[in-house]
């Protein structure tokens, strides 16, 4: 029974990740006026599965003088946490769903940090430090935005649909900045463009020493976290959970990647600490005073 429950949770997420990767490659190809995946299966539907098989049959390499246990555990930690985060969304009667999901998602930083430290590589460690700093910086604004919404629409932090059609005009305008900040923080939290570190594609990413299933687990965790954050945005800002709304938000992720240039490290740190955090804290203080 327990195994069946775990499979019911994991299998749909894995299938959605596979379709998200296919959709991203197809949309990016359309934006760049080139052909996307179209050989494997009908319209390239089997391409994600062949990519996963290719990664699965590659030889796992353990760097010399690395911490073997931590090196193997870090991708599994990231993968498990990306799946467990869906529990807070699936349990609709929980009183503190927002806090539960934020607590689980905040633990993802440990998988990234452990990967950079256990690799015993200066490039992986430097990439890990920058990725951790990015995630922690925008996680504060993300949590403050969620708590502000929780104080505004309910007496606790339970997930309630923020239906703009049922609200007066003034609160709608008050929620719009929080919605925009939340969407930008999602991009930073999931390490997506334009908040992706440019050197991560060269030799300074936290997962530079990983191959085979370890790299695949990090890849799956990233896209699963995108789906979780899109679901939270759909619930809080778009009137409720909907697969269509999550797909639209994912398309916005891909659109952002295909159109915007990357920020430098100092630029997105300045944006997080000097712009987003003061704004979200101001909204939190305002909504708390109204609730009191």
UniProtKB/Swiss-Prot annotation:
Ranges that cross the membrane: 2-22, 71-91, 98-118, 132-152, 167-187, 213-233, 235-255, 272-292
Q: Which family does it belong to?
A: Belongs to the complex I subunit 1 family.
Q: Which PROSITE patterns match?
A: COMPLEX1_ND1_1, COMPLEX1_ND1_2
Query: What's a Gene Ontology MF term here?
Result: NADH dehydrogenase (ubiquinone) activity
Q: What is its EC number?
A: 7.1.1.2
Any single Pfam family the record assigns to this protein = NADHdh
What protein does this entry describe? NADH-ubiquinone oxidoreductase chain 1
Say what the protein does: Core subunit of the mitochondrial membrane respiratory chain NADH dehydrogenase (Complex I) that is believed to belong to the minimal assembly required for catalysis. Complex I functions in the transfer of electrons from NADH to the respiratory chain. The immediate electron acceptor for the enzyme is believed to be ubiquinone.
Q: Which gene produces this protein?
A: ND1
Chemical reaction(s) catalysed: a ubiquinone + NADH + 5 H(+)(in) = a ubiquinol + NAD(+) + 4 H(+)(out)
Instruction: Give the membrane topology.
Output: Multi-pass membrane protein
What PANTHER family does its record include? NADH DEHYDROGENASE SUBUNIT 1 (PTHR11432), NADH-UBIQUINONE OXIDOREDUCTASE CHAIN 1 (PTHR11432:SF3)
Where is this chain primarily localised?
A: mitochondrion
Q: What are the record keywords, sorted?
A: Electron transport, Membrane, Mitochondrion, Mitochondrion inner membrane, NAD, Respiratory chain, Translocase, Transmembrane, Transmembrane helix, Transport, Ubiquinone
Q: What class of enzyme is it?
A: translocase
Q: Which terms in the GO cellular component ontology are assigned?
A: mitochondrial inner membrane
Q: Which InterPro entries does this one have? A: NADH_UbQ_OxRdtase_su1/FPO (IPR001694), NADH_UbQ_OxRdtase_su1_CS (IPR018086)
Which compartment or compartments is the protein found in? Mitochondrion inner membrane
So which domain of life are we looking at? Eukaryota
């Amino acid at each position: 029974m327990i195994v069946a429950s775990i499979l019911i949770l994991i299998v749909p997420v894995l299938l959605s990740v596979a379709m998200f990767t296919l959709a991203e490659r197809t949309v990016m190809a359309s934006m760049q006026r080139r052909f996307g995946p179209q050989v494997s299966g009908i319209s390239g539907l089997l391409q994600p599965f062949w990519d996963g098989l290719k990664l699965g049959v590659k030889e796992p390499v353990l760097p010399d003088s690395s911490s073997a246990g931590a090196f193997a555990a870090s991708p599994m930690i990231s993968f498990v946490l990306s799946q467990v985060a869906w529990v807070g969304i699936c349990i609709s009667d929980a009183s503190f769903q927002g806090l539960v999901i934020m607590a689980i998602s905040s633990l993802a930083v440990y998988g990234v940090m452990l990967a950079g430290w256990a690799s015993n590589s200066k490039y992986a460690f430097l990439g890990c430090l920058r990725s951790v700093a990015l995630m922690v910086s925008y996680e504060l604004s993300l949590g403050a935005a969620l708590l502000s919404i929780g104080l505004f629409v309910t007496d606790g932090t339970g997930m309630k649909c923020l239906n703009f059609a049922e609200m007066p005009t003034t609160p709608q305008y008050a929620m719009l900045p929080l919605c925009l900040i939340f969407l930008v923080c999602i991009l930073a939290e999931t390490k997506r463009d334009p908040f992706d570190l440019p050197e991560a594609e060269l030799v300074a990413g936290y997962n530079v020493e990983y191959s085979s299933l370890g790299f695949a687990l990090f890849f799956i965790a990233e896209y699963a976290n995108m789906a979780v954050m899109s679901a939270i945005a759909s619930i809080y800002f778009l009137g409720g959970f909907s697969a269509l709304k999550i797909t639209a938000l994912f398309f916005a992720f891909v659109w952002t990647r295909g159109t915007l240039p990357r920020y430098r490290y100092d630029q997105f740190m300045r944006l997080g600490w000097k712009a987003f955090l003061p704004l979200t804290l101001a909204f939190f203080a305002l909504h708390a005073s109204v609730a009191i």
